């Protein structure tokens, strides 16, 4: 369990509790979680973070009424900046989106502006929102992570408790390489409910070559680890930066959806540009 799992900042969350579903607009349903909870223990300060990035959300269950009462549906794309004070707690996000269901809006842009305003207020940071009509996305191909998949290794694993031990001496030689590694075996668990979170991860770096077996063992050790998606990605980034000391590093995870939402955080210290096309499990 993470050291801050019982922090008072988490006590008021609806996550893990029985809740009523409202279908009329209510911005107060949104709840934020301070990013400092997992940054402070590592000595990471908001004015001197070793990375940049965003939390990319896809909203698959978004519906409201137009001015005449006719239901509208859209797919939403949200990007929440890494500098925001809070991340958005996903169950509260789902409950908030449900509150749009029987609410009338004059037009699509009013919905977009409402989402952007409320999410920015909750996160205390920069948020951008785009809404897509279904016919804009129909026929869109399933994407994939570019890079070398490290999953097909003939190794024995019998320990699934999180540890950074595998990253000790995980680099070798003096030759500098530039490569992109991919794994679909990332599984962590919700910080509060301990429900499983399934994801694929892409690690792009320039530096001394990272031992792929040790890296895979490290990623598999998240299997019993309890943290939010965004926190796991930052943990992986910082662990790799600390132990492997690459010149450039980017870590990008795309998680499967839950409650009509998927979360796709990325962190980088280079000019990394993430692909936003959904993967096969999304």
Swiss-Prot record:
Keyword Nucleus among record annotations: no
Protein's organism: Escherichia coli (strain UTI89 / UPEC)
Binding positions (substrate): 88-90, 229-230
Database matches in PANTHER family: NADPH-DEPENDENT 7-CYANO-7-DEAZAGUANINE REDUCTASE
Subunit structure: Homodimer.
Name of the protein: NADPH-dependent 7-cyano-7-deazaguanine reductase
Gene name for this UniProt entry: queF
Any single Pfam family the record assigns to this protein: QueF_N
Chain's role: Catalyzes the NADPH-dependent reduction of 7-cyano-7-deazaguanine (preQ0) to 7-aminomethyl-7-deazaguanine (preQ1).
Enzyme class: oxidoreductase
Subcellular location field: Cytoplasm
Residue sites binding NADPH per the record: 90-91, 258-259
Keywords: Cytoplasm, NADP, Oxidoreductase, Queuosine biosynthesis
EC number(s) given by UniProt: 1.7.1.13
Molecular function in Gene Ontology: preQ1 synthase activity
Entry's family note: Belongs to the GTP cyclohydrolase I family. QueF type 2 subfamily.
Biological-process GO terms, alphabetical: queuosine biosynthetic process; tRNA modification
Active site: 190, 197
GO cellular component: cytoplasm
Reaction(s) catalysed by this chain's protein: 7-aminomethyl-7-carbaguanine + 2 NADP(+) = 7-cyano-7-deazaguanine + 2 NADPH + 3 H(+)
């Amino acid at each position: 369990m993470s050291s801050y799992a019982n922090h008072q900042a988490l006590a008021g969350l609806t996550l893990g509790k029985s809740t009523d579903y409202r279908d009329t607009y209510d911005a107060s349903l949104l709840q934020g979680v301070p990013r400092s909870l997992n940054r402070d223990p590592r000595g990471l300060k908001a004015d001197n973070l070793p990375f940049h990035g965003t939390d990319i959300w896809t909203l698959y269950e978004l519906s409201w009424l137009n001015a005449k009462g006719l239901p509208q549906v859209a797919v939403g794309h949200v990007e929440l900046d890494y500098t925001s004070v809070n991340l958005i707690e996903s169950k509260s996000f789902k409950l908030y989106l449900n509150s749009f269901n029987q609410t009338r809006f004059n037009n699509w842009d009013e919905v977009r502006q409402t989402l952007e305003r409320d999410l920015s207020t909750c996160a205390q940071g920069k948020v951008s929102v785009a809404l897509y009509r279904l016919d804009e996305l129909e026929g869109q191909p399933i994407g994939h992570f570019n890079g070398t998949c490290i999953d097909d290794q003939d190794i024995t694993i019998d320990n699934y408790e999180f540890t950074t031990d595998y990253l000790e001496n995980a680099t070798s030689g003096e030759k500098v390489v530039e490569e992109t590694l991919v794994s679909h075996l990332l599984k962590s668990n919700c910080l509060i409910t301990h429900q499983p979170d399934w994801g694929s991860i892409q690690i792009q770096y320039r530096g001394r070559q990272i031992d792929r077996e040790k890296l895979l063992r490290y990623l598999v050790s998240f299997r019993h680890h309890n943290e939010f998606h965004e926190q796991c990605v930052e943990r992986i980034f910082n662990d790799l930066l600390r132990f492997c000391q690459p010149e450039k590093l980017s870590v990008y995870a795309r998680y499967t959806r839950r409650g009509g939402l998927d979360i796709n955080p990325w962190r980088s210290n280079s000019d990394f540009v993430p692909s936003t096309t959904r993967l096969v499990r999304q």
